[in-house]
């Protein structure tokens, strides 16, 4: 970038920043970089196609007008994806761009009557730590929050326990209310939705129930996978979804798996869940875990050495809740023993947690329990003589994993599955092994279940 273009861009950023929220600026503009200027146009590098799409639709005129304000000339702005510039595969943004925002920069949350009272004030975009594992889900959530029902509807966020799905959902609700205090925002878990429906049916208050969930601008439902298999709940939510979507109201859903992987979910709901955008959150990498710990220490005003946080990030890998919990445990242990926080002290404080994780042995009953829960079955179903596909296939997956993850003999595995012959176990193992070579859905299912087994 030449010096003149550099100066022009710096002055432009000052204007753009004053016209946007801090979160929006950091997400969409900060990573951009001007690469060339001609008599009529300016080319600006952006990290990926998703960012380019947002910039073209929402911020192109703002950037152009800001440049005009600086140099008194209106240029045609062209956003170019980095990969197109370098003729390489799309470049992944480095975690060096993780933003530990100043906690004092968060706007005051405006509570809009009882509808927003279920939103956790701690779960905002400013308090969310961005890393490679969640960058796309964060950007998608912010895009929806900035333009409800105009960007992606529905937005479907999925990922494992404790990875930040609920945080993002609350952040969307807060952001919308900050910018529109009259918006009707409702956040609810699928369990609460189901329980309220049951009570409404029992008390003959169906219309009140429908009015509550259909007369809103934004509906956020957490853990939507739990409505699978519940016929009346799915029926009610199907009509609620249709009415809201037809009325151009925003719907945000979260789950522990993508729609296509939710067993016993009605096809008509599955297809609707896939209408908008599906974004996943992965287990955080080491750099993101470190950033999360530093953010937590900053929020709690704790002084913790980098080597101690590095030790925690190395030992606790599964999810954010455990990571933050480990930090608090170490601080509490330090206070109770009146000792300085060191790596040795951290090792003492976490020895029970770490030993459990390192000494954990996978068992066939644990595999059966997780597979049964995953497919909404009972363990007895896996041990039964039923041969219908909805039972037989999960049983074969459980046998495959039992062979793969334990040291049990084939006869012993067969015995654990209702006294089946070892040849049945061999058949199941070979069938799943063969299907894994070409079936992407099965690959995802087995990978997901394996993670759950290792974290159990």
From Swiss-Prot:
PROSITE patterns: DNAA. Gene3D superfamilies: 1.10.1750.10, 1.10.8.60, 3.30.300.180, P-loop containing nucleotide triphosphate hydrolases. GO terms for cellular component: cytoplasm; plasma membrane. It comes from the Bacteria. ATP binds at residues 162, 164-166. Transmembrane segments: none annotated. Pfam families: Bac_DnaA, Bac_DnaA_C, DnaA_N. Keywords: ATP-binding, Cytoplasm, DNA replication, DNA-binding, Lipid-binding, Nucleotide-binding. One of its GO terms (biological process) is regulation of DNA replication. Residues 1-73 are annotated as: Domain I, interacts with DnaA modulators. SMART domains: AAA, Bac_DnaA_C. SUPFAM superfamilies: P-loop containing nucleoside triphosphate hydrolases (SSF52540), TrpR-like (SSF48295). It is found in: Cytoplasm. Belongs to the DnaA family. Oligomerizes as a right-handed, spiral filament on DNA at oriC. Domain I is involved in oligomerization and binding regulators, domain II is flexibile and of varying length in different bacteria, domain III forms the AAA+ region, while domain IV binds dsDNA. This is Chromosomal replication initiator protein DnaA. It comes from Clostridium botulinum (strain Alaska E43 / Type E3). The gene is dnaA.
């Amino acid at each position: 970038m030449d010096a003149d273009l550099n100066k022009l861009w710096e002055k432009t950023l000052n204007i753009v920043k004053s016209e946007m929220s801090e979160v929006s600026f950091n997400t969409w503009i900060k990573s951009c970089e001007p690469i060339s200027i001609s008599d009529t146009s300016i080319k600006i590098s952006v990290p990926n196609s998703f960012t380019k799409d947002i910039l073209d639709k929402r911020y192109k005129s703002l950037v152009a007008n800001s440049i005009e304000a600086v140099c008194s000339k209106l240029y045609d702005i062209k956003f170019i994806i980095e990969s197109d510039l370098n003729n390489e595969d799309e470049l992944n943004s480095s975690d060096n761009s993780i933003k530990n925002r100043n906690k004092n920069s968060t706007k005051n949350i405006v509570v809009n009557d009882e509808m927003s009272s279920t939103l956790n004030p701690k779960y905002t975009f400013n308090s969310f730590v961005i890393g490679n594992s969640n960058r796309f889900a964060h950007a998608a959530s912010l895009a929806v929050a900035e333009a409800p029902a105009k960007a992606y509807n529905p937005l479907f966020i999925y990922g494992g326990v404790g990875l930040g799905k609920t945080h993002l959902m609350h952040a969307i609700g807060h952001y919308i209310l900050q910018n529109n205090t009259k918006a009707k925002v409702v956040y609810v878990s699928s369990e609460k939705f189901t329980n309220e429906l049951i009570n409404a049916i029992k008390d003959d208050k169906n219309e009140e129930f429908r009015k509550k969930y259909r007369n809103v601008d934004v509906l956020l439902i957490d853990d939507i996978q739990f409505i699978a298999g519940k016929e009346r709940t799915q029926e009610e939510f199907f009509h609620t979804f249709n009415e809201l979507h037809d009325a151009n109201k925003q719907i945000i859903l979260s789950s522990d798996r993508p729609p296509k992987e939710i067993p016993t979910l009605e096809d008509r709901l599955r297809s609707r869940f896939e209408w908008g955008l599906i974004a996943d959150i992965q287990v955080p990498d080491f750099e993101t875990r470190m950033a999360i710990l530093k953010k937590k220490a900053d929020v709690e005003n704790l002084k913790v050495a980098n080597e101690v946080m590095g030790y925690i990030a190395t030992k606790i890998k599964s999810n954010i809740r455990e990571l933050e919990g480990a930090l608090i445990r170490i601080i509490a242990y330090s206070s109770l023993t009146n000792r300085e926080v060191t790596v040795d002290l951290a090792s003492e404080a976490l020895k029970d947690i770490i030993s459990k994780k390192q000494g954990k042995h996978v068992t066939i009953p644990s595999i059966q329990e997780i597979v049964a829960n995953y497919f909404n079955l009972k363990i007895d179903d896996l041990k039964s003589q039923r041969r219908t596909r909805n039972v037989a296939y999960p049983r074969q997956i459980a046998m495959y994993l039992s062979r793969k993850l334990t040291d049990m003999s084939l006869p012993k595995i067969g015995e654990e599955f209702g006294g089946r012959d070892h040849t049945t176990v061999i058949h199941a193992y070979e069938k799943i092994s063969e299907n894994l070579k070409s079936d992407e859905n099965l690959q995802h299912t087995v990978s997901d279940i394996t993670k759950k087994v290792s974290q159990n």
